[in-house]
Amino acid sequence: MDFAVITNNIGFLIFQGFFGLGNFTGGTLRLAVPAIILGFLLGVFIGIGRLARSRWIHLPATLYVEFFRGVPLVMVIFWFWFIIPVLLGKSLPEYSVALAAFVIFEAAYFGEIVRAGIQSVSRGQAEAATATGLRRAQTMRYVILPQALRNMIPSLLTQSIVLLKDTSLASIIGYVDLTKAAQIVNNREIRPFELYLFVAIIYWLCSYGMSTYARHLERRLAINPA
């Protein structure tokens, strides 16, 4: 074993592969952070749609969730990589394809978290808000969602961990994330054990840090309920 391959290529692996600060349009965090934010925002609308009284809103939101939770992420990535460019008549950059695929896919999971969070809020809260004269949309915005978000935080962090690890799948379309960066170095150095062990450690450190924070939040929220 020769771990000098790591130290000799640490700049490319970390700055390019993990942070996306190199010459390639890539980076694990550069993909994961926007995907988490945009996926959650879309998930809020989907989660609220799942609870809508109108079947014209509830049914499409339900079908969306059931469909994307029933197909593998890698298939969604391939759809955006091979099929969407054919429909548009032009090719798309790896980053756009990966980001769109992750946002669309993860929104289904974030939507279910939002739905469960909203349902965890006591019905009496909505009834009290209605009694004060608030409309349904105002009740959702000012009363239900703030309390629901508190209940969602641990689950949102857990799903974000899953998304962070899943970004390694973007390497199959040539997106230069941490996994792809290790593959590029390995093609030159032929040191798969050292390189992929390093990649695994980086993912583990990120996941462990986020999961530890999620457990801390769960304990804190349990001690200080809303």
Language model regions located:
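Transmembrane alpha-helices and adjacent helix-loop boundaries
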Residues: 1-226
